[in-house]
């Protein structure tokens, strides 16, 4: 089929690769405009943009798909279908109705749970046992269209947003060509989403990344894993040169009792919850400002935290 692919982050790259491998004609790839990245904050293309260019595919990076110019350019592609995977923009009706067979979205949750921008992170932070990937026909509402196919994925005890991202990307990239083949032959069954159990995965904001040690150990653990590796849940630790920001990248819940935020041993067991009733979390991986991510043992060699140290 002649299709357009709309995607931006790393999650979308494998999906585009599978569609190319399946022999579809990629008329155009759409992605978000280049953005400041890295320490130098230089403008760099998105992962999808860079990958598409490496394949010699035409790329457009509009600030908005809502302008008359972009709508007309999209129509002029004369598409059979459009595939959207974490593009990052809302598509208006004129865009959705332009392809002959419609626009289809790969979404990283089991809809209607976790509609919206951050389904992977929110599923872990909420303590969900399972999540998944689904292909749906797009409508004007946010992730409200009928579902064509999907697959469940278990969320393991030490799952992070990063590891779950990779699992879901692998499942989704395999699913997309199968879904498009069914759509092309007219054999795709569309199931309306339930009106019950609707939740929204709000975009992760930097302000919510700081760890609140007064929450229970289970909540702190999910917070850490749900925000790992990006943006990274963080706390401040005392040092000879003042407070140092540390990102906690992996943790597990353990028994322990103490004032919230206080180290219970010299191996990163931190008390959680109010009144000593919240348990504790063991930090398994951490990262200081200006340093790379390190396993706890290596981290402590360069930045020891003794029992009784209060973290903020």
Curated annotation (Swiss-Prot):
Q: Which reaction does it catalyse?
A: L-methionyl-tRNA(fMet) + (6R)-10-formyltetrahydrofolate = N-formyl-L-methionyl-tRNA(fMet) + (6S)-5,6,7,8-tetrahydrofolate + H(+)
Membrane spanning residue stretches: none
Top EC category: transferase
CDD domains, sorted:
FMT_core_Met-tRNA-FMT_N, Met_tRNA_FMT_C
**EC code:** 2.1.2.9
Q: Which branch of life, at top level?
A: Bacteria
Pfam families given in the database record: Formyl_trans_C, Formyl_trans_N
Keywords associated with the record = Protein biosynthesis, Transferase
InterPro entries, sorted? Fmt, Formyl_trans_C, Formyl_transf_N, Formyl_transf_N_sf, Formyl_transferase-like_C_sf, Met-tRNA-FMT_C, Met-tRNA-FMT_N
Q: Which GO terms describe its cellular component?
A: cytosol
Q: Does the keyword Nucleotide-binding apply?
A: no
Q: What protein family is recorded?
A: Belongs to the Fmt family.
The cross-references to NCBIfam families, in alphabetical order and at most eight, read: fmt
Q: Which HAMAP family match?
A: Formyl_trans
Q: What does this protein do?
A: Attaches a formyl group to the free amino group of methionyl-tRNA(fMet). The formyl group appears to play a dual role in the initiator identity of N-formylmethionyl-tRNA by promoting its recognition by IF2 and preventing the misappropriation of this tRNA by the elongation apparatus.
Question: What is this protein's record name?
Answer: Methionyl-tRNA formyltransferase
